[in-house]
Design a protein with these regions (language model features):
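Short hydrophobic beta-strand element within catalytic cores of glycosyltransferases
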Residues: 299-302, 312
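A short helix/loop element that forms part of the nucleotide-sugar donor recognition site in Leloir-type
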Residues: 184-197
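Nucleotide-activated donor-binding/catalytic signature segment of Leloir-type glycosyltransferases, i.e.
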Residues: 246-262
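Carbohydrate-associated surface elements
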Residues: 156, 177
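Aromatic "clamp/platform" in nucleotide-sugar-dependent glycosyltransferases that forms part
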Residues: 263, 282
Length: 376
């Protein structure tokens, strides 16, 4: 088969989370290197600009009808996939996050008499939390087994999927990635002074503030750090646990040292002023925000769970601690904040690891090669 540009459909959640970020950046990079990319979702993914050459967005319209307690998004998505596949002559549809995208893609393929390849990328909670729920497991397993290709963002997630679902189809590990030309440390003395006017150290956390991120631990750990080291905590993002976290902050009496920044576009500017990035999650299938921090020369203190040990090297690019051990995590952060030389050395090692192993210019060609293998 002549390797001419492909016409690729991409379906993802358009929200503020790792799967949507990776799907968006993958599509944009595929377009930059010559492929035609069609995003199909209920809203424009937040990193997709209004216009970029060879990038198109197709909005899924969900019908509201009194008979439906819950609007049937998966059916509307299937119909839109078929419509776009026919009109744009798609070679394949690449869905990110299995539930419900993979089952919608399977139905679309059947409606197209099998003339459409399906690639499913597993990102984490689609398998570990949602897909493994008894209500969704049968359809998730069936849809995965009928995908033409499956990729996973970490070796941990690959093993977890095989064990949980008992499927026999091969799963290719293609890790998440960063663009090292974008995620690069910037000199921002004015921004730093805004948040730390008296030279305080800065600890940063970025997430969707869901229970799995353990915001309570973040506050507990920061309170322990703040007792000994003048520091500020920047909490970037938003989500269901914010109110509890605010209460917890008041209980500890550290409110004047904590800033909730909400959802931010200028992430690199914030990473660039951070001294430590903190990710004490219950589980992480990869930990994209940790990788982004590392690329900006920020050492990471995280939990030794899921795919995080595949990203963060303990004692070299940061520290990995036990889930819920607030004293261990506090000691790791204090060690980094007190020792400028160690912190800077770990930051440089973190940057080197990020650009050596998780570079967009190395990872996207792996997806490209994977597509060609399936199509041939």
């Amino acid at each position: 088969m002549t390797k001419q540009p492909l016409r690729i459909g991409i379906t993802c959640y358009p929200t503020y989370g790792g799967s949507g970020v990776i799907a968006s950046e993958l599509g944009l990079q595929l377009a930059r290197i010559g492929h035609e990319v069609h995003f199909i979702s209920y809203d424009r993914p937040f990193r997709i600009p209004a216009f970029q050459e060879r990038v198109y967005f197709h909005k899924v319209q969900v019908v509201e009808y009194p008979l439906f307690q819950y609007p049937p998004y998966s059916l509307a998505l299937t119909s839109k996939m078929v419509e776009v596949a026919n009109q744009a002559h798609l070679d394949l549809i690449h869905v990110h996050y299995a539930v419900p995208h993979t089952s919608s893609a399977y139905m679309a393929k059947q409606m197209l008499d099998g003339n459409l390849k399906i690639v499913t990328t597993l990102h984490g909670t689609d398998i570990t939390l949602v897909g493994s729920n008894p209500n969704y497991m049968p359809i998730t397993r069936f849809s995965l087994e009928h995908s033409d290709g499956i990729t996973s963002v970490s070796e941990f997630l690959r093993e977890e999927t095989l064990e949980t679902f008992g499927i026999t189809v091969p799963i290719e590990v293609i890790p998440n990635f960063i663009d090292p030309d974008i995620f690069i440390k910037q000199a921002n003395p004015k921004t730093r002074e805004t948040f730390a006017p008296h030279g305080e150290k800065i600890v940063m956390h970025l997430s969707n503030f869901r229970p799995v991120k353990r915001l309570g631990d973040i506050v507990d750990v920061f309170a322990l750090v703040q007792k000994e080291i003048p520091a500020k905590l920047l909490l970037v993002g938003d989500g269901p646990e914010r109110y509890k976290a605010e209460q917890h902050i008041r209980e500890h009496g550290v409110g004047e040292h904590v800033k909730f920044l909400g959802k931010q576009e200028a992430i690199v500017e914030l990473f660039s002023i951070a001294d430590v990035y903190f990710l004490p999650s219950e589980t992480e299938s990869f930990g994209l925000s940790a990788l982004e921090a590392m690329s900006c020369q920020v050492p990471v203190v995280a939990t030794s769970v899921g795919g995080l040990p595949e990203v963060v090297v303990h004692g070299e690019t940061g520290f990995l601690c036990s889930v819920g051990d607030v004293h261990e995590m506090a000691e790791a952060i204090k060690l980094l904040l007190r020792d400028d030389r160690k912190r800077q050395a770990m930051g440089k090692s973190a940057r080197h690891r990020a650009i050596s192993l998780f570079n967009i210019h190395d990872i996207v060609p792996k997806y490209e090669s994977y597509y060609w293998t399936l199509l041939s």
